[in-house]
Amino acid sequence: MLRFIARRLVSSIPVLFGILLATFVIGRLIPGDPCQAALQERATPERCEEFNSEYGFDDPIFVQFGSYVGDVFRGDLGNSVQERQSVTDLLIDRLPVTLQLAVAALVIAVVVGVPLGVLAGSRHNSKTDVATIVGANLGVSIPVFVLALILQYVFALQLDDTPLGLPASGQLTAGVIPEPFYEVWGIGQNSLFEFIANIDLLNAVLIWRWDIFVDALQHLILPAVALATIPMAIIARMTRSSLLDVLGLDYVRTARAKGLRERVVITRHALRNSLLPVVTVIGLSLGTLVGGAILTETIFNLTGVGKTLFDAITGRDYFVVQGFTLVVAFGFVVVNLITDIVYTFLDPKVRVS
């Protein structure tokens, strides 16, 4: 298993290098001047000359790329032109926000999507099946930003004074400033602890503040549901389609011929094999979540990876674009690796070798 993981990680290096090269080139092709974007009205010729010299923008393009690749191998992702801090510090601050949102959305998508698909597939051509298909098609068709605005209008405005009311913002309630767990525990501070402390739900559990946990959860529900809708619909459709295919196989018909109840046939015989393609879809859903996070974070006022990337692209903050894209790409590699490992447990015919 360890050799398999190491082999997959090594084979991913060319992919990551290609992504690094692509983001570097595309970033330089975007029209505009990074000095003008960063300094705006303060961008005099003298200041721009100092600015370009400080960040290496006056070097030849190949020298810039070589310097950046060397810095990456040393663990240095560069410094943000707009934020005036290291990209690593920005990641520690912004990535936990997106990670919490993406995990919550993925959990909702799987917990709701898989049972809906199983229910529809096990009752083929019934009203439940038709309703699931219509709902899934509708879920795929609605843009994330439209659904986000609808959710805000319904739950944050129309139902605000009812028990169903939810906050329109994804941030904690104003004035709620939780202490980092490492300060409460009296242990040393490091980058990993800062990263964990920036995950509101996890930090609230670690400091045993359930009032903060509930507040964070309430602010997370609407953006997570908005982000989860498209992958949830895709997972439901794939689960239904895969289950219908498996239910038509000989071994399932044999199980039915033995007099087994339909619930036993589905749960013990058909479901496991029907989940194989669903696992792949769940892994690929990460791309949908990252892409949708840009709009979701903007609408719900969350400062995560998506919003930071959008601001970096519009502000020509090369190092942030390259650093964040590289980290997200590495996340894709890890997710694909986990997907392959899960395959080996679900299907005995698939071997790690």
Can you name each region flagged by the protein language model?
Residues 36, 58-114:
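An internal, D/E-rich "acidic patch" concept
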Residues 15-66, 155-212:
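Hydrophobic alpha-helical transmembrane segments of membrane transport/permease proteins
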